[in-house]
Amino acid sequence: MTIYLPELIPSHSTVFPNIENALNNPDGLLIMGGDLSSAQLISAYQHGIFPWYSDGDPILWWSPSVRGVFFPEQFSPSKSLKKFFRKSNYNVTLNKATYQVIDLCASTRPKEETWIMPEMIKAYKTLVDLGYCHSVEVWNDNELIGGLYGLQIGQVFCGESMFSLQTNASKIALWKFCEHFVSSNGKLIDCQMMNPHLESLGAQEMKRSDFKTLLEELHVKPTSSDCYLAQTLGGSSFS
């Protein structure tokens, strides 16, 4: 099957087409080309677009017809997860080891399954330095055992990836971040594409048009000023 895609013009690389112009097959593919500069990535996320491509492919930009999202105030951990956390030695932090979280999200996946290639790692670490990319870490004593990272776009957190090296670590990262995000006036967590794991955690499907409308409203509204300061989000001893 031949696919004809528009290509980002280098001199206008932060200008994306309307996401309603994305293809139906493959679902959500919008445009190719450009680069992973900070300006281009921030513009993409502000418009509900994200990069996703394989090694050797051009950069492909997506906005699927159905989005996976969390409304953090609705996130409800199971009784078993709460009990597990209370009995564990886990502690949860925010922005204490973002570079490490990005590296582990990439390295803990089979090579053929990861889209987090060296150029993407470099690009998102640059966004860390600029204050746009943030992480949640889960520790067992001093060992980093799970976490997630993503971008802040106003009152929206655009989740990129998560990893878990020990039982329930990524679930606890998401739970504690939802609690913190709500208290900081955060409204929406974008998961990009729905999958069974996210659905099992309570993610909901949202049509692209509805997501676009909500994103346009929320991306210009701020969270509280201390939302992304490096801090502890909770430990099993005081959960």
From Swiss-Prot:
Catalytic reaction equation(s): N-terminal L-lysyl-[protein] + L-leucyl-tRNA(Leu) = N-terminal L-leucyl-L-lysyl-[protein] + tRNA(Leu) + H(+); N-terminal L-arginyl-[protein] + L-leucyl-tRNA(Leu) = N-terminal L-leucyl-L-arginyl-[protein] + tRNA(Leu) + H(+); L-phenylalanyl-tRNA(Phe) + an N-terminal L-alpha-aminoacyl-[protein] = an N-terminal L-phenylalanyl-L-alpha-aminoacyl-[protein] + tRNA(Phe)
Keywords: Acyltransferase, Cytoplasm, Transferase
EC number, as in UniProt: 2.3.2.6
InterPro entries for this protein: Acyl_CoA_acyltransferase, Leu/Phe-tRNA_Trfase, Leu/Phe-tRNA_Trfase_C, Leu/Phe-tRNA_Trfase_N
Compartments it resides in: Cytoplasm
Main subcellular localisation: cytoplasm
Listed Pfam families: Leu_Phe_trans
UniProt-listed GO biological process terms: protein catabolic process
Superkingdom classification of source: Bacteria
GO molecular function, one term: leucyl-tRNA--protein transferase activity
Catalytic EC class: transferase
Gene3D superfamilies: Leucyl/phenylalanyl-tRNA-protein transferase, C-terminal domain, Leucyl/phenylalanyl-tRNA-protein transferase, N-terminal domain
GO cellular component, one term: cytoplasm
Signal sequence extent: none
Family the entry assigns: Belongs to the L/F-transferase family.
Function: Functions in the N-end rule pathway of protein degradation where it conjugates Leu, Phe and, less efficiently, Met from aminoacyl-tRNAs to the N-termini of proteins containing an N-terminal arginine or lysine.
Name under which the protein is recorded: Leucyl/phenylalanyl-tRNA--protein transferase
Organism lineage string: Bacteria, Pseudomonadati, Pseudomonadota, Gammaproteobacteria, Vibrionales
